[in-house]
């Protein structure tokens, strides 16, 4: 049996989405900036997709800017806001458990004179709001806290973050790549100025995403050289993928209630099974305020990579963390930030369920996981010493 439990890394393209995309590879191949018929046809398709994305998050169509994905959108916000607001100051604040797209860009900005404050989180992964209040100065130009964490699934109190930032007139960005399509996202309700998203997280194509930019806020251009995306991001529009993103997000929102309920029930069944059948294991992140799909565990006395390899041989596909950094041998910065000891963080696995997973698949995964953990622990000197003591 093959069981795919890595939907936080990526999802397949829904057949309904692919069906909408295919004509734009062939007969509807126009450049959306061309003035002739096939170009106008392409422009209409892009406008429709922009409207679909806007409607999904309660934004205006002219507040949606298509990008190559979530990482590009995150990078754009950090660099663009710092550039456009340099006269005010050179300080930004982000959480200590942001995606690597944010963390790496923030580190790069530090090398170029930007002061970055990293907010602590508690054991559930929730940001320290008191620290945020105290960290804001008259030179702070941006606060960025992800809506939902990509590793442990924790859903952050973004409205509280916005409330604090707005008291001081500071712009707010949220990386909602894991949230959009999975839980309701309303930019007006949240109050954010910027929001990142990526189509391949909600059964759309890879290589396309979007950045919500609230009308009137100051941000620099991402790419110069053309008039695409209202002259903010030059480059020929990725037509078929943009069409696919629009269709995918519309379907995701339409089916969200039903899918979220079923996935949450299945995930809770899985979590209960793991905690009941396997000793020396901890669930990472908050039990309730987490994404429907997410279950992240740390298995003591064994390495996560060994667990993953054994699961893969049995047909179960999961992750040891974010797919963008899964090749690293370093323990997850997110797990360390929530207080997981280094030696235990190394034994962590993220399972992320999708809309097609079944109870039969979860039962199979539980059986395989129990066997794998037992077998690996028998070979672990640390585990054997612990048993003797």
Short names for language-model regions:
Residues 1-389:
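Pyridoxal 5′-phosphate
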């Amino acid at each position: 049996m093959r069981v795919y439990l890595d939907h936080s890394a990526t999802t397949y393209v829904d057949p309904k989405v692919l069906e909408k995309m295919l004509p734009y590879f062939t007969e509807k191949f126009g450049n959306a900036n061309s003035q002739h018929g096939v170009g106008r046809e392409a422009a209409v398709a892009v406008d429709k997709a922009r409207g679909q994305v806007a409607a999904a998050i309660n934004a205006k169509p002219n507040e949606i800017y298509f990008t190559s994905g979530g990482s590009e959108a995150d990078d754009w916000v950090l660099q663009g806001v710092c550039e456009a607001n340099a006269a005010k100051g050179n300080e930004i604040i982000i959480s200590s458990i942001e995606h690597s797209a944010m963390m790496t860009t923030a580190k790069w900005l530090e090398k170029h004179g930007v002061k970055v404050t990293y907010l602590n989180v508690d054991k559930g992964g929730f940001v320290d709001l008191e620290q945020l209040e105290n960290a804001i100065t008259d030179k702070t130009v941006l606060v960025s806290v992800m809506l939902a964490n990509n590793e442990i699934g924790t859903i952050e109190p973004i409205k509280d973050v916005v409330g604090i930032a707005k008291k001081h007139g500071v712009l707010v960005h949220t990386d909602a790549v894991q949230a959009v399509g999975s839980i309701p996202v309303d930019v007006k309700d949240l109050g954010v100025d910027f929001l990142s998203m990526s189509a391949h997280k909600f059964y759309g194509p890879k290589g396309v995403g979007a950045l919500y930019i609230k009308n009137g806020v100051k941000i620099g251009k991402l790419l110069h050289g053309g008039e695409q995306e209202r002259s903010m991001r030059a480059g020929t529009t990725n037509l078929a993928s943009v069409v696919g993103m629009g269709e995918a997000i519309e379907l995701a929102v339409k089916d969200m209630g039903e899918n979220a309920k079923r996935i949450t029930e299945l995930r809770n069944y899985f979590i209960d099974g793991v905690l009941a059948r396997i000793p020396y294991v901890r669930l990472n992140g908050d039990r309730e305020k987490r994404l429907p799909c997410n279950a992240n565990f740390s298995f003591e006395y064994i390495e996560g990579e060994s667990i993953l390899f054994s699961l893969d041989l049995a047909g179960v596909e999961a992750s040891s963390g974010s797919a963008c950094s899964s090749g690293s041998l370093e323990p997850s910065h997110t797990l360390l930030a929530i207080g997981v000891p280094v030696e235990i963080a190394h034994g962590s696995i993220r399972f992320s369920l999708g809309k097609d997973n079944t109870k039969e698949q979860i039962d199979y995964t539980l059986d395989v996981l129990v066997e794998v953990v037992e077998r690996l622990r028998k070979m672990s000197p640390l585990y054997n010493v612990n048993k003797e003591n």
